[in-house]
Each structure stands twice: as C-alpha cells, then as structure tokens.
Amino acid sequence: MKILYSLRRFYHVETLFNGTFVLAGRDQETTGFAWWAGNARLINLSGKLLGAHVAHAGLIVFWAGAMNLFEVAHFVPEKPMYEQGLILLPHLATLGWGVGPGGEVLDTFPYFVSGVLHLISSAVLGFGGIYHALLGPETLEESFPFFGYVWKDRNKMTTILGIHLILLGLGAFLLVLKALYFGGVYDTWAPGGGDVRKITNLTLSPGVIFGYLLKSPFGGEGWIVSVDDLEDIIGGHVWLGFICVFGGIWHILTKPFAWARRAFVWSGEAYLSYSLAALSVFGFIACCFVWFNNTAYPSEFYGPTGPEASQAQAFTFLVRDQRLGANVGSAQGPTGLGKYLMRSPTGEVIFGGETMRFWDLRAPWLEPLRGPNGLDLSRLKKDIQPWQERRSAEYMTHAPLGSLNSVGGVATEINAVNYVSPRSWLSTSHFVLGFFFFVGHLWHAGRARAAAAGFEKGIDRDLEPVLYMNPLN
C-alpha cells in the first residue's frame, strides 16, 4: 500500500550525525533516520520488521536455553539452589519439575529437557528471523494481507491487540493445566515443609480474586503481592485466562469507539510507548513479588525474603536461649520491651527486638506455632519441630541483603554465608529494567505526541542558552 505522507515530514526529530552514510540502500535523507536508529528504518516495512521481531525472540529463547543448560551443568544437588546463584532452575522447580518433599531436587533431567527444547526453538526462530530480514518480502500487505498492516489502521491494530490477548490468556491456562492435571506445582505450604501437589480446590470466587486488586499496597495489606496460597494463585490464572481470551475476541470483533480514536495517538511509535509502559508496570510488580512473596517464589528455591530471614534469626535465638533456661515469655530486652516476644500494635504476640517491624511475615516454618492471638507461648515451649529449627537457622544465614542501611537486626558479614540471594538479583534487575522501560515510555510517548501534533523538530537550537555564554577558556 502506498504511504500517504512524506516520511521526512512525519518523522519530526532531526538527527544531525553522519547524514551521508548509506546502509542497505537507505540513507538519512530518504528515510529521515540515521544508521544508528536501527529498526526505525523498518517502520513501514512490515516484512523486515517481522524478521527483526522473530530474530529478537530467537535471541531471547536462545538465552533461556543456554542459561538453563549452564545452570544444569553447574548445579550441585547437595546445596540449596539459592546458594548457587541460579535464577532459571528455581522457576522450573516451582512448577513442580524434578523436586520432591522439602524442595529437594530428585532429578535434573527435566531441567536438561527444558534447556534443549528452548535451544531447538531458538534455532527455528533464528532461521525465521534471518529469512524474513534478508529473503522474505519487504512488506506483507500485498502478498499476505492477513499479516500486513498500516500503523494508522485502527481496526487492524485492535485486531492485533486481540490476538496478543488470546495468546496471553492461553499462557495463563497452561499454568492452570500444569497445576490441575500435569503433575501439580510446588506448594511451600504443604504440611511438613513443602511438597509438589495437584491443586484440587481452586479459588474461583470473584470476591476473593478481585479482593486482592482492591487491597491497599501498603504493609499488612500488600495488594496482589500478599497472595499466600496456591489455590488463589491458580484460580487467579483461571480468571486471567478467561478475561484475556474474551477481551481478545472482543478486540478482534469490534472497532475502536470514537472516544478511543480521539484519546490515543495511532502510530507505530505510540504503540511502542504503550508497550513500554505496560512492561515497566510488569517490571515493578515482579520486583515486589519476588522480594516479598514466598508462595509464588518459594524460599526453598529463591532463599528467604528479607523479613523471613530477620524473623528466622529471632526464632533461632529464641530456641537456643529457651534450651539454656531463659523464660522467653517474660525476658526483657535492653529497651524494656520483650527480648524474645512482645505485642504488636493490635495485640498479637510477635517476636521482639529489631525484627518487630516484620511482625506480619507469614512463612510455612512459622505458622504452625501461631494461635488465635499470634505466637502461642505453649507451642513455642512444646511443639517446635527439628525441621523448623533447621530451616530457620538456614534462612537466618542466607538473608537477601547486601545493604548499607539497617537490616532488621540480621547478623551480616562475619557470622553469615557470603552470597547474593537470587531474590536480590531478580528484584533489583526487574526494578532497574522497569525504571528504564518507564523512561523509554516517556521518550517514545513524547516523540509520538510531537509527531501527531505536527512538530518537525525537538527544541529550537537557536534559543539554546549555551550560545550566549562565554567560552570556558
């Protein structure tokens, strides 16, 4: 299809670098983009852009497969995953592959299979990417109209959105099928310290599922990050799957309403900015999820959360001193508050000391010792099991720290194992990526709005303050 506007008029941002450089028969003069603007040269070449996207998917899947095999090759079954710097095997273990009671790895073969499948898939995607980038048609509109598009075609854009939503919904259903029928998933809350189990009693009540979305994001509430049982997680994926699939069908069958046509900018760069904003939100949510949640991210694989390590230390010393004859119910600490136990603002019995700030932690090794009013003194005296002692001592020395500020009283450096927790890696990386994607969203949204408003340039350099200043020398 013929493009109706002049490219140079439409792409408003001047690029004053090497304007004479010609690459693949394209130069800055005819495209409005310099060589370093990469895929911008492909904005109106749907076939070439398809090649770039498929090749990019191939790189992503190649990394997943290669890193997966790298982790399998370096894996030591005798050590916990979180002590070995692993970030992919914990995800596979959480899905119930290769692990048994207590999160012990029984078989690494499923992990090997996963790596090989991803490598093979990446080869297929890589071939497709190279084919479409070099050999396939430059544009798809003429030969494959179903796959062709023009960025301004609002109806086609919402159809593509619908197809994406259906695929996301099917992805959510894959997790549901794994949990219900194909071996189950790892449940850190299973009695006796966690196990793989099939989820039989799904939470489908909209009040519960959407209650998470309506909760406050702050302490003790924690929005969706506070989810702490697998029935709710898998039930949420059932809801999400249906919402995405039906939303996708709706977007395929309908055209954008007038208010939507007016509200949005309808250009390739605008869609890029919307996508970056969504990915930024995902990154920030993932950061909070992996940092605070020990149900979707079991501590057996990812290491304890910060609050969990701090509470584990308080518990470990309570056990030790109780054995040495301390009366943990009444001992006073240096501040006059309880040394081992105290009361929260709402009256529950909680651990004393600096870890009091984490009093709303829930963890499978601790919950059996709670009664209706918080920690139960008689259970603490009579019911502590060896596995709870072992696990809390292990978690106490593997806090996800590395911080310059207060660490909730956790013994760091000299007394602890020197390691970096996967929770630290995953939450920090997703926060940083979320931030950069947000900056990318602002950048591309600004450019897209400027183009829609008809500016050709960014700032007018004639009014640049530096032009009126004396040279430094």
Curated annotation (Swiss-Prot):
One of its GO terms (molecular function) is metal ion binding. [CaMn4O5] cluster binds at residue 367. InterPro entries: PS_antenna-like, PS_II_antenna-like_sf, PSII_PsbC, PSII_PsbC_sf. Keywords: Acetylation, Chlorophyll, Chloroplast, Chromophore, Manganese, Membrane, Metal-binding, Phosphoprotein, Photosynthesis, Photosystem II, Plastid, Thylakoid, Transmembrane, Transmembrane helix. It is a multi-pass membrane protein. One of the components of the core complex of photosystem II (PSII). It binds chlorophyll and helps catalyze the primary light-induced photochemical processes of PSII. PSII is a light-driven water:plastoquinone oxidoreductase, using light energy to abstract electrons from H(2)O, generating O(2) and a proton gradient subsequently used for ATP formation. HAMAP family: PSII_PsbC_CP43 (MF_01496). PSII is composed of 1 copy each of membrane proteins PsbA, PsbB, PsbC, PsbD, PsbE, PsbF, PsbH, PsbI, PsbJ, PsbK, PsbL, PsbM, PsbT, PsbX, PsbY, PsbZ, Psb30/Ycf12, at least 3 peripheral proteins of the oxygen-evolving complex and a large number of cofactors. It forms dimeric complexes. This is Photosystem II CP43 reaction center protein. It comes from Brachypodium distachyon (Purple false brome). The gene is psbC.
